[in-house]
Amino acid sequence: MTEPITPEIVAQHGLKPDEYQRILEHLGRTPTLTELGVFSVMWSEHCSYKSSRVHLKTFPTSGPRVLQGPGENAGVVDLGDGLAAAFKMESHNHPSYIEPYQGAATGVGGILRDVFTMGARPIASLNALRFGDPSHPRTAYLLEGVVAGIGGYGNCMGVPTVGGEVAFHPSYNGNCLVNAFTLGILPADKIFRGTAAGVGNPVMYVGAKTGRDGIHGATMASAEFDASTEEKRPTVQVGDPFMEKLLLEACLELFQTDAVVGIQDMGAAGLTSSSVEMAGRGGNGLDLFLDQVPLREEGMTPYEILLSESQERMLLVAAEGKEELVRSICEKWDLDVAVIGRVTASGRWRAHWRGAVVADLPVDPLTEGAPKYHRPMTPHPALPALHAFDLATLPEPADLGAALVRLLARPTIASKEWVYRQYDHMVRLVGAVRPGGDAAVVRLAVSHDAHAHKGIALSVGVNGRFCFLDPYLGAMHAVAECARNIACVGGEPIAITDCLNFGNPEKPEIMWQFAECVRGIGDACRAFGTPVVSGNVSLYNETEGQGILPTPTVGMVGLVEPVERTCHSTFRDAGDVIALVGSLQGEVGGSEYLSAEHGKEAGRPPALDLAREKAVQETVRRAVRAGLLSSAHDCSEGGLAVALAESCMMHEVPSDGSKPAWIGCAVRIPFPVRKDFVLFGEDASRILVSLPKENAARFVDLAQQCGAPVIRLGAVGGDRLEIQGALSVPVEELARAWRDGIPAVLRRDAAHAGATAPV
């Protein structure tokens, strides 16, 4: 007997009453429970982008290097000489909060599949992580679990994690963020897409068996958390990186044949989403025969088979007559493989089970016909008072040196060495610079010797405080800082991906934040010539009604040529000249200093002049390529004083356990406003450089040609950071505070009896 569809069942599936009414209108009848489950996942925010799609369409998505823009598993850009890069960033926020190790691990697995589904071999990963207040009882538990999950999966796959960012803020206490980025390399003329083309072609299942893990994961990722969060552990997928490694190699071998017509990762919403999306892109129908799906558990129902999010699975459309070729390659790699369906001309998506049709739905309402909302928007009501706050009324610290030490110990600013030492960043020997700098640089020579002179620069980042205080400007800052980081290693930005993390879009102030951030990213990308080629939206990042800071993470890719001429972020030689490319405004609105020293998150983010920003970047990029610089370091969180301190400290402790290496500096800074504002303000468009004295005149000439201001500050040398008239601190003391920031979080947690306290 068919189970009746009640309002309670509709609500359990995350559908609103008006959405269910639309389903009835599309079908002209009551859906079965299986069909309701299909609509539930396909109309979830995670799959349909129903609240965000109207805004995302405003992004610039085309350009001379774009080979594949948004809408596929990953974006693809042309690197020249017949080579291309596929890349994307994806969130796994909700699963990682519920079960941090598996949530983060399967997030890595999912983004790797997105990239190699395009025909690319993944060569590098990054991540952008957000955790709650360091003193919160759950923060260390999540930090340890997430980092272990990322390292555990990526290390087993043999894909190096070469960079990223980690930040802490109380708004993430109940909702951590795990944004995973992967880039792969492929021939520019061999891109594979997720389309069900060719009526009569077989639909084949490849990979791990299907179990009950992850059922309704997409729906869970489209809802707020509450007191029942711990009960949602069964919706978190379980990953097997060794199975994924076999799947990767099998797919890359299949791509060398003529057997693959289309291929799609079974990610969110599993077999349902992958098959529906392939049918939608191909403009065709699809018949699935669920009896043929390889199962890991007994007694699974069609509903469970279709909605399972078991990992390490692919759906491919093979050329008719090539089934045995696909089968032989997959069996060679010890993978399950089965023909489970056919492409049809019906325009309908059908699922068969034991001789009966258990779902028969038109494809269009599940894809392009899904709801699209123009939700109400209004500025956040707290902003006028925050903008009006008089920063000049704040007291100046009595000891600026002590303030700098405290700032360096803040986990957001502190060394991330504890994190990246758990990642195998040396595997495949692609890294041209070690983790800890402004941008990661990977060589292409390991995979393609003919391209030995080329490298790729990678950067991820965003400042959530800036985006809260001014979403439009904050989002522009995210793009500008990623581009600045790439300029610091001599790279030319070419494209971005994004991961847009926000709270509940049904709240007008959250929807306004989202729309303004999208507008800011779009305008900045147009200015830098960096189209948006892929991305992800993660909404409902709220717990008990408390939302996260708006966090539109940007991941940028740049071309470094020649890769031998890249640059590091730390001072190198005593006697080198230190200079600031940019100006000194002392803008502390939304800064880490304001929060750390005064407990305030107020004011406006620093002004951003895109013409000035581009001039600063062009100056440094050309100087790096000309070999003029010893170091280049972006001034961001913590301002100029933190940038100077970081430049004094090595990012790697010697493996023999000897005293860490560092070098001091002595500088004289003009103070147009209060000293603390100049030292710790996070003014935009600034890069701190060091260079041999003999290169100084050429560098100043270059800056003048590019239209960028340069301020000569002082020289590298000694064992103290000395800022005349402001502070003098031993670099050893700075390094001790900086290196201990994150270990201190873990020690604090160990001191609590309830280290893994429930939510």
Swiss-Prot record:
UniProt EC number: 6.3.5.3
Gene3D superfamilies linked to this entry: PurM-like C-terminal domain (3.90.650.10), PurM-like, N-terminal domain (3.30.1330.10)
Enzyme class: ligase
Recorded GO CC terms: cytoplasm
GO biological process terms held by the UniProt record: 'de novo' IMP biosynthetic process
A single MF term (Gene Ontology): magnesium ion binding
Superkingdom to which the source organism belongs: Bacteria
Chain residues that bind substrate: 91-94, 113, 237, 309-311, 538
Record-linked Pfam families: AIRS, AIRS_C, FGAR-AT_linker
UniProt: Mg(2+) 1 binding residues: 90, 536
Keywords: ATP-binding, Cytoplasm, Ligase, Magnesium, Metal-binding, Nucleotide-binding, Purine biosynthesis
Pathway given in the UniProt record: Purine metabolism; IMP biosynthesis via de novo pathway; 5-amino-1-(5-phospho-D-ribosyl)imidazole from N(2)-formyl-N(1)-(5-phospho-D-ribosyl)glycinamide: step 1/2
Keyword Cell membrane on entry: no
Chain's role: Part of the phosphoribosylformylglycinamidine synthase complex involved in the purines biosynthetic pathway. Catalyzes the ATP-dependent conversion of formylglycinamide ribonucleotide (FGAR) and glutamine to yield formylglycinamidine ribonucleotide (FGAM) and glutamate. The FGAM synthase complex is composed of three subunits. PurQ produces an ammonia molecule by converting glutamine to glutamate. PurL transfers the ammonia molecule to FGAR to form FGAM in an ATP-dependent manner.
UniProt name for this protein: Phosphoribosylformylglycinamidine synthase subunit PurL
Organism the protein comes from: Anaeromyxobacter sp. (strain K)
